């Protein structure tokens, strides 16, 4: 999905019907005029796990290090990776209130993948008419639909 130079745009979203419940994740990748869509789901999960999984799947789809602009509607993902992660690691995967970090397995995988690329993390408000975010949301819901069909 990557070429020598340039920026890969990744638009990610997670969805859950019930929380916990069946969930899905969706990714729209764009490099220049090339687009690729990815999606999947899990029968019993949470919305936050699906948001993290979407970001992970986006970065896993890239076959070499590159610059990525990753756009999510999840403040949990954006703030987690840009603000909270270093503190969690310093505290042995504990929050500031000394509780275990939820979804540690996914945070560790996302941290590992993000270190391989140069990632700019962007946030957009969900369900606010952002075309690529709406597409990622539709893909996440497709992931759920195929599970429960």
Swiss-Prot record:
Keyword Oxidoreductase: no
Keywords: Cytoplasm, Endonuclease, Hydrolase, Magnesium, Metal-binding, Nuclease
Reactions this protein catalyses: Endonucleolytic cleavage to 5'-phosphomonoester
Residues that hold Mg(2+) 2 according to the record: 13, 137
Main location: cytoplasm
Compartment(s): Cytoplasm
Gene Ontology annotations for the cellular component aspect, listed alphabetically: cytoplasm
Pfam family for this entry, one: RNase_H
EC number, as in UniProt: 3.1.26.4
Cofactor annotation comment: Binds 1 Mg(2+) ion per subunit. May bind a second metal ion at a regulatory site, or after substrate binding.
Cofactor: Mg(2+)
Assembly, per entry: Monomer.
Function, in words: Endonuclease that specifically degrades the RNA of RNA-DNA hybrids.
Family statement: Belongs to the RNase H family.
Name used for this protein in its record: Ribonuclease H
UniProt source species: Halorhodospira halophila (strain DSM 244 / SL1)
Name of the gene this protein is made from: rnhA
């Amino acid at each position: 999905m990557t070429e020598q130079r340039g920026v890969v745009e990744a638009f990610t979203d997670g969805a859950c019907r019930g929380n916990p419940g069946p969930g899905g994740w969706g990714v729209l990748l764009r490099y220049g005029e090339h687009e690729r869509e990815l999606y999947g789901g899990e029968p019993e999960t949470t919305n936050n796990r699906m948001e993290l999984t979407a970001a992970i799947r986006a970065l896993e789809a890239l076959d070499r290090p590159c610059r990525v602009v990753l756009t999510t509607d999840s403040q949990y993902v954006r703030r987690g990776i840009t603000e909270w992660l270093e503190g969690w690691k310093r505290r042995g995967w504990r929050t500031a209130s000394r509780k275990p970090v939820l979804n540690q397995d996914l945070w560790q995988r996302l941290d590992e993948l993000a270190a391989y690329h140069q990632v700019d993390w962007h946030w957009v408000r969900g369900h606010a008419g952002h075309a690529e975010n709406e597409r990622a949301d539709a893909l996440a819901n497709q992931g759920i639909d195929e599970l429960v069909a």
